[in-house]
Amino acid sequence: MYGGLGAHVLALTQAQARRGHEVAVITQAKPGDAGSHVNSNGVEVIRVANHYPDAQMVHERFANWVHGFALASQTACELMSRKPEIVHGHDWIAAGQLNVAAKQFSVPSVLTVHATEFGRHNGWLTSRLSQTIYANERRAVQSADSVIVCSEHMTHEIRCGYGVEPKNLNVIANAVSPLLSIAQRTTHNSENIVVGFIGRLEWEKGVHHIIDAMELIIDERVKLEIVGTGSQLANLQEKVQRKRLGDRVSFLGHIEDRDRAEIVQSWNLAVIPSSYEPFGIVALELGQVGVPIIASQVGGLRDIISSSEFGYLIGEISGGSIARGIESILSNQTLAIKKADRLRSRVEAEFTWDSVVDLTNSVYEKVSA
């Protein structure tokens, strides 16, 4: 399991196990590993070896990888300690084995959609790979007995882009685990004013817009820290050098989860300029720490920062709009901290794994009735 989807499945299944549910997870082993069958924090985990371990985003290789995972998962179903009462898959890659398991055990199937190819490209599916992914996604959501999405925006995306009936759609927001410890935010003593970004360095995440904003901000004390890696790293670094911002923009690379809160806490504000964000888990992670947020008014970000009480939303994603947002926060940091504190309280109260388990159980009960 990788990325945000893997983190979601890990947290959800462990929360379900703590409630007394018997949970088994079938996932792929690391490339080269033979597979394993273990109990991890109350969750039965079956990792299967894929005979096509190369998951490069090339059409033929990627299709083979997905097919190999489906074949391996069929055998893994027979290893489960008990017959399941329901099967739950995450995203279209798991759809093949989800359907096989549902038929094999004669039980209902639930599919959680974390993002879609249709939404990622605004419906413009020009490459063969995108068209293949879209076709698989469409089959997946239409064959599942019930579909879970993470935001109100995603219900529109699934209905319009994939033809799923509203009665089969359920909105369950994501969640974050409580921080083990975090010091109270204090006034920044540094002369620098730090703007932060954390996430994958991909085009849809909009980091290039923050770099454009830095060029427009005259105050040399304003610095940008970029946390994360991705396919756009080299392009972004070249953009920084071209704009002669090397002394004001730092690329920190990948930061382990346990160290992120400390880094984020040192920021004066954070920017989430995504053009596509089905949910926006990063807004919860930033909100949990209490850092003021500027976010684009897209997808699930609108559900989290639902009003100006909790942060700053920008309609037009551009360097100019981000620069104006940064200057607005810096002109009244007391107000910005109040908004951040309200968001932190909301995250702690509403976006919990206990709530996700309760809502997921309701879907299970409805689809099993």
Give each language-model segment a name.
Residues 1-45, 369:
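N-terminal subdomain of nucleotide-sugar transferases
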Residues 108, 118-139, 178:
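Nucleotide-sugar donor phosphate/pyrophosphate-binding loop at the beta->alpha transition
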Residues 292-295:
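Short hydrophobic beta-strand element within catalytic cores of glycosyltransferases
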Residues 188-214:
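Conserved donor-binding/catalytic core segment of Leloir-type glycosyltransferases
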Residues 237-255:
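Nucleotide-activated donor-binding/catalytic signature segment of Leloir-type glycosyltransferases, i.e.
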Residues 275:
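Aromatic "clamp/platform" in nucleotide-sugar-dependent glycosyltransferases that forms part
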Residues 307-308, 312-319, 328-333:
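Conserved acidic donor-binding segment of nucleotide-sugar-dependent glycosyltransferases
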Residues 153, 175:
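Carbohydrate-associated surface elements
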